[in-house]
Amino acid sequence: MRLTASQTRLITDRVHQHFGAQAKIWLFGSRVDDCKRGGDVDLYVETDHPELLSELRCKISLEEALDLHVDLIVKKAGQNHPIQQIAKAEGVRL
């Protein structure tokens, strides 16, 4: 996994700040592969409170703090997209 311990803590803190402590977070995509370089931070979040405003604020907060592009996918009620299963199956739970 190509994130430092402090970056991982920052991500979990910010996501929990915006979505609550019950939010579950997965890192997926190129940052999971230690052999790759660069790339954005792909995050998948499951929460009981998937509000669009919280999603936007969280994304901006993470991008400013990490100085990296963040792709944030938040599961919404009734949604079941393939990317959600991929993120959970191939990703790393933070």
Where are these regions (language model features)?
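Catalytic core of pol beta-like nucleotidyltransferases
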Residues: 1-26, 32-38, 46-94
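Conserved RNP beta-strands of RNA recognition motif
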Residues: 43
